[in-house]
Swiss-Prot record:
Chief subcellular location: cytoplasm
Keyword S-adenosyl-L-methionine listed: no
Quaternary context: Interacts with UvrB in an incision complex.
Ranges of biased composition (kind: Low complexity): 487-505
Ranges for domain UVR: 208-243
The name this protein goes by in its record: UvrABC system protein C
Any single GO BP term: nucleotide-excision repair
UniProt cross-references to Gene3D superfamilies, sorted A to Z: 5' to 3' exonuclease, C-terminal subdomain, GIY-YIG endonuclease, UVR domain, UvrC, RNAse H endonuclease domain
Gene name for this UniProt entry: uvrC
All residue ranges annotated as the GIY-YIG domain in the record: 16-95
GO terms assigned for molecular function: DNA binding; excinuclease ABC activity
Length: 728
C-alpha cells in the first residue's frame, strides 16, 4: 500500500479552480474520478490523517500512486467531464456511478410508428436519438417526468402499448395528461411523431422557441381570464426551466468542435485539445513538445492539426476547429482538413460567447500542463537515469542499457507455446517494437529450449538485417538463414480480446510491421520506419532480460554465442525471490528491494509476461473456435463471416449449391467452388458438448464457428481460476 504523502502535490501546485481529478494506481490505471468546485480544497481532504478518512476513501488513497487534474471554468463543465471520464476509464472506486454495465442515455425511438421515450444502455441503434450519458437512470426519469407535462410522448413498452390498444383503455399516464395516448387513437401517428420531434429539439438545446410560445399562450389565457389554463401553462414553463437546469451543456447540442490551445515558453510548448461532441466535452488530449527552433504559435497549431487528423477521415474530423492562432497561410490547412472530412471545415479563432469561454478553459489546462511538465520532468529523468545506472553497475556494463529487450515463454500445460519480446528504451516501454513468436521447432513443454529458439530466431534476423543495411563493410555476414519453418515473428496487430488494460496501462499493441510466419527475407535495401530507423529486428539491445533463472539465462547466452554475438549483455529475473541471474555465474545478484534498477527490471519482466500470456490466450481461443472454413485457402476472416451470416450456419452452407454460394457479396465462382470442395471433404464433426451446461450443440447452435453478429466464447476445460493456474 502506498503512503499518500509520497505523491501529494507540493503546496501551491493545485489550482483553486473548478475541475476534475483522477487518481491512478502504480500501473497507471485510473481508479477514481471526481469533480470539485475547488480542486485545492477537495484534494486537500484526501491527504489528511488517514484515521479521519472514510474506510473506502482510505483504501482508495493508499491504493493510488499519483493524482492529476484538469481545470474547467464551471461546475457544469466539471460534471460533464466527470461523466465522460468515468465512462472511459471505468474506475474501480466509482461504483456508485454505475447502475449497470454501461451508462444510461435518454433515447427517443424515432424509427418507430409511435416514438417512445425511454432509458437505453449499450450499443446505439440506427434511427434512435440519444441524449446523455447520465450518471444515474433516475436522473433521466426525473427529467422525462418534468418534460411529459409539456411533451406527452409515449413512454410505455411494446407489450403495454399493445395491451392498451386491445382493451381500448390507456395507462395511468394517459389519464393524468402525461401521455397523449396514441394507443387508443387520441392522437394521430403524424401528430405524435411531431410531438416526439419537438421533445428532441428541446433536449438538443433549442429551448427558447418553446418557452416563448408557452409564455405567449399563458399571457393570452390570462387576458381571456382562463386562469386555470394560465396556471397550468405557468407550471409547464417552470417544469421546462427546471429540466433545463438538469440537462445543462457546455455548448449548444448541435456543436461538434475541437478546441486546441497552446502554452509555450522559449524551450517547450504544451498543447491541449478538448473534443466537444453534441455540446459536451467527450474527451481531452494533450502533449508537451520541445521547441528545437524558433516557431510561431500558428506553426505549432499546424503541427497539432497534422498529428490530430493525419490518420482520421469522415466524422472523426469535426466541422469546426477552434484555435488560438491561425497557420500562415491558412487556406492549405483548411483545404487539407476538408479533404479528410469530405466536407467543409471551419478553422477559426473564437471571438465571443461560450466558445471563447471554453477556449479560455482549454488554455488554462495547457498552461497547467506546461507547468506540471516542467516541475516533473527533472525528477522523472533523474529516476529513470538512476535506474539504468544501477542496472549497469550491478551487471558490470560499460554504459547504461538504453535499449532493453525482455523475453518470456507462455503455454498451457505444453500446448500453444508462444513467446513475447517487449522493448524498453530509456526506461520507457516502446510498444511499436513489441513482437510475438510461435514456438514450432518442437512439441511439448520445455521453457529452456523455447527460450533458446526465440533468442536464436530474433538475433539471426538482426544479423540478416545488419547485412542488408550494409553495416558489414567486408561483405561477410549471414549466408544461410535456416529458420524453423513457419517460425518467425507471429503476425502483429491482432490485439488479444478482453485484455482489459486501461489506456495508460497499455493494452498490448504492435504496429503491424512484424513478418508473418515463414515470411522469407528478400534482397534489396532495408525499409525504414517513419522516424528513419531500421524496421523489425535491425536495432540491437544493450541488454537482454529473460523471465526465469539460471537455466533460461544459460540458454539465451548459448544462442548468442552460437551466432557469434558478444556485445549484448544477458540477465534473468527469477520470480518470487526477484534474484538477477547472470551467465556463467553460480550465485545471483541481489539488488536492494528499494532499488530503482530492480523496479525497472520488474516492470520489464511483468510486461513481457503480460504480453506473452495475452497472446497465448488469444491463440488458444482461436484454436477452440476453429472450423472447416479455416482450412479453405484464400478465405479470410471477413469473407468467412459473410458466408456464415448469409447462410446462418456451416450446416446450411454445406448443403448450398455453388450458385447459391456465389450470391454472397465478395465470393466469386472460383472461391465458391473451393469452399464447396473443402466442405465436401470435411467430415462433419461429432456434436460438440457445452462443458458448462452439458447440452449438445450442432452447427446451427453457432459452434464451433463465430458469427459476425455474436462473437463466440472459447470452450476450455476447468474453471477460469483453474485455467489461470495452469498457464505460464
Amino acid at each position: 500500500m502506498a503512503d499518500p504523502s509520497s505523491y501529494r502535490p507540493r503546496p501551491g501546485e493545485i489550482p483553486d479552480s473548478p475541475g476534475v481529478y483522477r487518481f491512478r494506481d502504480e500501473h497507471r490505471r485510473v481508479i477514481y474520478v471526481g469533480k470539485a468546485k475547488s480542486l485545492r480544497q477537495r484534494l486537500a481532504n484526501y491527504f489528511q490523517d488517514l484515521a479521519h478518512l472514510h474506510p473506502r476513501t482510505r483504501t482508495m488513497v493508499t491504493t493510488a500512486a499519483s493524482v492529476e487534474w484538469t481545470v474547467v471554468s464551471t461546475e457544469v463543465e466539471a460534471l460533464q467531464l466527470e461523466y465522460s471520464w468515468i465512462k472511459e476509464y471505468d474506475p474501480r472506486f466509482n461504483v456508485k456511478y454505475r447502475d449497470d454495465k454501461s451508462y444510461p442515455y435518454l433515447a427517443v425511438t424515432m424509427n418507430e410508428e409511435f416514438p417512445r421515450v425511454q432509458v437505453m444502455r449499450g450499443q446505439k441503434k440506427k434511427g434512435v436519438r440519444y441524449f446523455g450519458p447520465y450518471g444515474h437512470a433516475w436522473a433521466i426519469r426525473d427529467t422525462v417526468d418534468l418534460l411529459l407535462r409539456v411533451f406527452p410522448v409515449r413512454t410505455c413498452s411494446a407489450g403495454v402499448f399493445k395491451n392498451a390498444a386491445r382493451t381500448g383503455r390507456p395507462c395511468l399516464l394517459g389519464y393524468i395528461g402525461k401521455c397523449s395516448a396514441p394507443c387508443v387513437g387520441r392522437i394521430t401517428p403524424d401528430d405524435h411523431w411531431d410531438l416526439a420531434d419537438e421533445f428532441c429539439d428541446f433536449m438538443a438545446g433549442r429551448t427558447g422557441t418553446y418557452l416563448r410560445r408557452l409564455e405567449r399562450q399563458m399571457a393570452e389565457a390570462a387576458e381571456e381570464m382562463e386562469y386555470e389554463r394560465a396556471a397550468r401553462l405557468r407550471d409547464d414553463i417552470g417544469a421546462l426551466k427546471k429540466a433545463m437546469e438538469k440537462s445543462a451543456v457546455v455548448l449548444a447540442d448541435a456543436t461538434d468542435a475541437d478546441l486546441i490551445a497552446v502554452a509555450e515558453d522559449e524551450l517547450e510548448a504544451a498543447v491541449q485539445i478538448f473534443h466537444v461532441r453534441g455540446g459536451r466535452v467527450r474527451g481531452q488530449r494533450g502533449w508537451v513538445t520541445d521547441k528545437v527552433e524558433e516557431i510561431t504559435t500558428g506553426a505549432l497549431v499546424e503541427h497539432a492539426l497534422q498529428q490530430l487528423y493525419g490518420e482520421e477521415k469522415g466524422d472523426a474530423v469535426p466541422k469546426e476547429v477552434l484555435v488560438p492562432a491561425l497557420p500562415d497561410p491558412v487556406e492549405p490547412v483548411q483545404q487539407w482538413l476538408a479533404e479528410r472530412r469530405g466536407s467543409g471545415v471551419s478553422l477559426r479563432i473564437p471571438q465571443r460567447g461560450d466558445k471563447k469561454a471554453l477556449m479560455e478553459t482549454v488554455q488554462r489546462n495547457a498552461q497547467q500542463a506546461l507547468v506540471l511538465h516542467k516541475t516533473k520532468r527533472a525528477s522523472d529523468l533523474t529516476t529513470r537515469s538512476r535506474a539504468l545506472e544501477e542496472i549497469a553497475e550491478a551487471l558490470d556494463l560499460d554504459s547504461a542499457p538504453l535499449r532493453i529487450e525482455c523475453y518470456d515463454i507462455s503455454h498451457l500445460q505444453g500446448d500453444d507455446v508462444v513467446a513475447s519480446m517487449v522493448v524498453f528504451e530509456d526506461g520507457l516501454a516502446r510498444k511499436s517494437e513489441y513482437r510475438r513468436f510461435q514456438i514450432k521447432g518442437f512439441e511439448g513443454q520445455d521453457d529452456v529450449r523455447s527460450m533458446h529458439e526465440v533468442i536464436t530466431r530474433r538475433f539471426r534476423r538482426y544479423l540478416a538485417e545488419k547485412e542488408r543495411t550494409g553495416e558489414w563493410a567486408d561483405g561477410e555476414g549471414l549466408v544461410d538463414d535456416a529458420r524453423h519453418p513457419n517460425g518467425d515473428a507471429a503476425p502483429n496487430g491482432d490485439a488479444a480480446p478482453n485484455d482489459g488494460a486501461a489506456p495508460d496501462d497499455g493494452a498490448a499493441r504492435t504496429d503491424g510491421r512484424g513478418l508473418t510466419d515463414g515470411q522469407e527475407l528478400t534482397d534489396g535495401p532495408a525499409l525504414k520506419d517513419d522516424d528513419g530507423r531500421p524496421k523489425r529486428f535491425a536495432y540491437p539491445p544493450q541488454l537482454v532480460v529473460v523471465d526465469g533463472g539460471q537455466p533460461q539465462v544459460a540458454a539465451a547466452q548459448r544462442a548468442l554465442d552460437e551466432l557469434g554475438i558478444d556485445d549484448i549483455a544477458v540477465c534473468g529475473l527469477a520470480k518470487r525471490l526477484e534474484e538477477v541471474w547472470l551467465p556463467r555465474e553460480d550465485d545471483p545478484v541481489v539488488l536492494p528491494r528499494t532499488s530503482e534498477g530492480l523496479y525497472l527490471l520488474q516492470r520489464v519482466r511483468d510486461e513481457a509476461h503480460r504480453f506473452a500470456i495475452t497472446y497465448q490466450r488469444a491463440k488458444r481461443a482461436k484454436r477452440f473456435r476453429a472450423g472447416p472454413l479455416d482450412d479453405v485457402p484464400g478465405l479470410g476472416e471477413t469473407r468467412k463471416q459473410a458466408l456464415i451470416k448469409h447462410f446462418g450456419s456451416v450446416k446450411k452452407l454445406r448443403s448450398a449449391t455453388i450458385d447459391q454460394i456465389c450470391e454472397v457479396p465478395g465470393i466469386g465462382r472460383k472461391t465458391a467452388e473451393t469452399v464447396a470442395v473443402a466442405l465436401a471433404r470435411a467430415t462433419p464433426a461429432a456434436p460438440a458438448v457445452n462443458t458448462a451446461t452439458g447440452e449438445i450443440m450442432d452447427d446451427d447452435d453457432g459452434a464451433p464457428e463465430t458469427t459476425a453478429d455474436a462473437p463466440g466464447e472459447p470452450v476450455s476445460a476447468g474453471t477460469p481460476d483453474e485455467r489461470r493456474g495452469q498457464e505460464r
